[in-house]
Amino acid sequence: MTRVEELLSQIKNLKTEKNAIILGHNYMEYSVQLVSDFTGDSYDLAVKAMKTNAKIILFAGVYFMAEQASALNPNKKVLSPDPNAGCTLSDSLDVKTLQEYKEKYPNAPVVLYINTSIYAKALADYIVTSSTAVKVVQKLNADTILFGPDANLANYVQQKVPNKKIIKVPPNGRCIVHANYTKQLVELARKKYPNALLMAHPEAPLEILESADFVGSTNQMIQFSKENKNEEFIVATEIGMINALKIKNPSKKFYPLVTTEACACARCPYMNMINLEKVKRSLEEEVYEVKVPEDIAERVKRAFENTMKLL
């Protein structure tokens, strides 16, 4: 038995013993996705967390995702295998900056991407994902909207909803992975894989999205590649997504826009901090518990409910 097989077996036993479930983000490494009870994007997993009867929820993803699960599930124990697994997007917007924008634009609703710290989310009117951002903004009864922290997603929403003024909060919030994508990389990938369709995440720069055959969230990419007759796809998002796509569509071929050999930017260093050893320890010792203050959790839940009413 290999070490990976041993860990998978031990984690499976721990889940039963502790009445725990593992929620694994689509960007997780292959072995972590295998041991997860549910895989998906951050919103999908937050909803799954609300529906589970498990006593313990282990979130195999970056820290803001565990915060989100805790806010929506105050009576359950939520664990993060590594509390240092941060997010450049989440870190790019602090409460002070958001409050300054709210004071400057008092009548503008605040729409925050789910990749935001829980304390900033507590000041939001709506919390969206890459798959719901356009739909929510379209339905808002406001001409000016504060949108953050992802500037690329804000640009995409602005393009899709030109009749509204999107103010980026902050002006330069970026994902460390998607920020490095260029049109030149797209041209090289298309030349290398001429029969492949390009799928891009809305966190990518607008020039990448305009070159893509499909733009969508990680879950939407899985669905698109499953339903599309094409057999090959170039994937313009974090390289761990290739694992999720191969698990769900084993007969098709998926190529990352950029490989880890070509650029360190292909892999999110924070997502990469979560591995089987840490997952096992987290379940075994029930660390590290993520607990969101009650008043913050209530405000975040209210913003989520506001969003759900529009979808």
Swiss-Prot record:
Which coenzyme or cofactor does it need? [4Fe-4S] cluster
List keywords of the entry alphabetically: 4Fe-4S, Cytoplasm, Iron, Iron-sulfur, Metal-binding, Pyridine nucleotide biosynthesis, Transferase
Looking at the keywords, is Transferase present?
Answer: yes
Alphabetically, which GO biological process terms does the record hold? 'de novo' NAD biosynthetic process from L-aspartate
Biological pathway: Cofactor biosynthesis; NAD(+) biosynthesis; quinolinate from iminoaspartate: step 1/1
Gene Ontology terms, MF aspect: 4 iron, 4 sulfur cluster binding; metal ion binding; quinolinate synthetase A activity
* Residue sites binding iminosuccinate per the record: 25, 42, 113-115, 130, 201-203, 218
Compartments reported by the entry: Cytoplasm
Q: Carries keyword Transferase?
A: yes
- Tell me which residues bind [4Fe-4S] cluster: 87, 175, 268
Which Gene3D superfamilies does this entry report, sorted A to Z?
A: NadA-like (3.40.50.10800)
* Pfam annotation, one family: NadA
Q: Report the catalytic activity.
A: iminosuccinate + dihydroxyacetone phosphate = quinolinate + phosphate + 2 H2O + H(+)
Enzyme Commission code: 2.5.1.72
Cellular component per GO, a single term:
cytoplasm
Free-text cofactor note: Binds 1 [4Fe-4S] cluster per subunit.
The enzyme class is transferase
Tell me which SUPFAM superfamilies the record gives.
NadA-like
Please describe what this protein does: Catalyzes the condensation of iminoaspartate with dihydroxyacetone phosphate to form quinolinate.
| Name of this protein | Quinolinate synthase
UniProt gene name: nadA
